[in-house]
């Protein structure tokens, strides 16, 4: 639903602006991506294990990262865990039904994804789908333009993209079960 990111074209432009090589820019992006996915995976593992009453061991999860990135994760992860603990403490009305739930539609859309948490809201007496995000940015709009049809009235920002994602998951649950989200 959005324009594909042309990594080489963008890296060429960034390299020229920063007076470095395209390879250096791509390597920097790869390391940043590895850092982000490692941090996100570790937080998601913590949350999943928290709801399953399991202890989390984080050793060995730093493959491919340098010392600085590992240190940054060790500093950032406790902060993110604190945010999750605050969320949990502030939302005792949300009871975990299932973590890491796979949702998909093999007959029509051929789309599949995974949500972090399916919970029951005791206040509204309804199910809710939650997905925890660790993005660097969480914007509603972006300078990169609008999404493609049928979302062409929405900007390409992370908030809009994740809103669509959760609504697609909602559609799957309601299509294939008797549950309402």
What is each stretch, according to the model?
Residues 101-181:
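Mg2+/Mn2+-dependent nuclease catalytic core
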Residues 1-108, 112:
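Nuclease catalytic cores
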